[in-house]
């Protein structure tokens, strides 16, 4: 992987790593504002509220997929050395199984709780928004692994790739339909996951 080729004894340096991650957060804040501006202009207030409620609901629900496992990577990753990859694979396998279960259950619950009148047009949206939240949680383990081996700069790029992709696609769908915005929301985390898998 790219991180194996590029790192040569690179260590975790809290001050440096904090700067990289804080910079990524600042960039993503700008992307987040742009995303919300596009959504508020494109949707009626009810649709915007439902979209955000579903997204927030799924982000809360999929914390169950996290299972606290990435914390182990953050704590022990540097000490594990080459063994980190094996631990990461095991964690990813466990999270994938939890993710499959989540995708079967949470979209139905979210759609039932928050969509007025049982509009089936929102069911596809619920699936895509849940998928985006699930993928973000799975990506977190790989991002944490990058940070654990001293590559917070690469983690920063992964974070920006997620929100940046969503923002760019949102602008492209600015005059589009609800499903288009949901697709954009799902593609960003998928791009970030692909990048994280390539990097580690």
Q: Which residues make up each language-model segment?
A:
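Alpha-helical transmembrane segments of multi-pass membrane proteins
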Residues: 60, 64, 100, 104, ...
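Hydrophobic alpha-helical transmembrane segments
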Residues: 123-130, 156-200
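C-terminal transmembrane helix end/exit motif
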Residues: 1-3, 7-10, 70-73, 141-148, ...
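Signature of the first transmembrane helix
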Residues: 13-70, 107, 132
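Membrane-embedded alpha-helical segments of multi-pass transporters/permeases
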Residues: 33, 37, 41, 64-67, ...
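Alpha-helical transmembrane segments of multi-pass membrane transporters/permeases
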Residues: 15-28, 85, 127, 131, ...
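Transmembrane-helix boundary and interhelical linker motifs in polytopic inner-membrane proteins
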Residues: 7-13, 43-47, 61-94, 147-153
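Residue-level recognition of transmembrane alpha-helices
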Residues: 21, 25, 52-55, 95, ...
């Amino acid at each position: 992987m790219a991180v194996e080729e590029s790192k040569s004894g690179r260590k975790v340096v809290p001050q440096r790593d904090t700067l990289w991650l804080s910079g990524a957060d600042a960039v993503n804040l700008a992307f987040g504002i742009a995303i919300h501006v596009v959504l508020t202009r494109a949707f009626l207030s009810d649709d915007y509220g439902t979209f955000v409620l579903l997204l927030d609901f799924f982000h809360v629900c999929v914390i169950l997929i996290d299972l606290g496992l990435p914390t182990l990577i953050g704590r022990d990753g540097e000490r594990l050395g080459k063994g980190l990859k094996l631990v990461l694979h095991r964690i990813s396998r466990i999270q994938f199984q939890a993710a499959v279960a989540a995708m079967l259950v949470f979209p139905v619950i979210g759609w039932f709780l928050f969509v007025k009148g049982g509009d089936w047009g929102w069911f596809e949206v619920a699936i895509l928004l849940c998928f985006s939240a699930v993928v973000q949680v799975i990506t977190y383990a790989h991002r944490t692994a990058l940070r654990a081996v001293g590559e917070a700069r690469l983690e920063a790029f992964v974070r920006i790739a997620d929100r940046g992709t969503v923002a760019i696609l949102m602008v492209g769908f600015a005059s589009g339909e609800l499903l288009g915005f949901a697709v954009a929301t799902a593609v960003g985390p998928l791009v970030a996951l692909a990048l994280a898998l390539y990097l580690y």
